[in-house]
């Protein structure tokens, strides 16, 4: 190739490679704001009794508030787990409200959440 054609080609190619490299290095936020959700669920099953349901509720509620403040969504299961914790503490109305929120945010959970809500209302 003649030198005059090669220089613009090399320039364009280097620009494309640079743009691709910068895009790959960009900090991508995840789809959900996980907060302490995974740690809470893990601790609940791996070390039962280490953290009371009330302590877990406080942490998950704070995570939910933080996610809303950032315009993000808590992960799937967040409100279902919160509802379960409310159930454990006898707060059935709050449990149902959490299950309803899970249904709205994650429609694929509707069948399971409806079943749980139905059992709580009996």
Give the ranges of each region predicted by the language model.
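Structural register within alpha-helical repeat arrays
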Residues: 81-82
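TPR/TPR-like alpha-solenoid helical repeat scaffolds
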Residues: 110-122
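Residue signature of alpha-solenoid helical repeat architecture, marking inter-repeat boundaries
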Residues: 31-34, 73
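Bacterial signal peptide processing site
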Residues: 26-28
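C-terminal motif of bacterial Sec signal peptides marking the signal peptidase cleavage site
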Residues: 21-24
């Amino acid at each position: 190739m003649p030198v005059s054609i090669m220089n613009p080609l090399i320039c364009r190619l280097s620009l494309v490679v640079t743009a691709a490299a910068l895009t790959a290095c960009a900090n991508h936020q995840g789809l959900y704001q996980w907060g302490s959700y995974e740690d809470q669920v893990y601790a609940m099953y791996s070390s039962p009794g280490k953290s009371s349901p009330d302590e877990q509720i406080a942490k998950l509620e704070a995570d939910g508030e933080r996610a809303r403040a950032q315009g993000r969504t808590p992960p799937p299961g967040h409100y279902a787990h919160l509802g379960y914790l409310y159930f454990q503490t006898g707060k059935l109305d709050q449990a149902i409200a959490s299950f309803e929120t899970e249904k709205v945010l994650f429609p694929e959970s509707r069948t399971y959440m409806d079943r749980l809500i139905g059992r709580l209302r009996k």
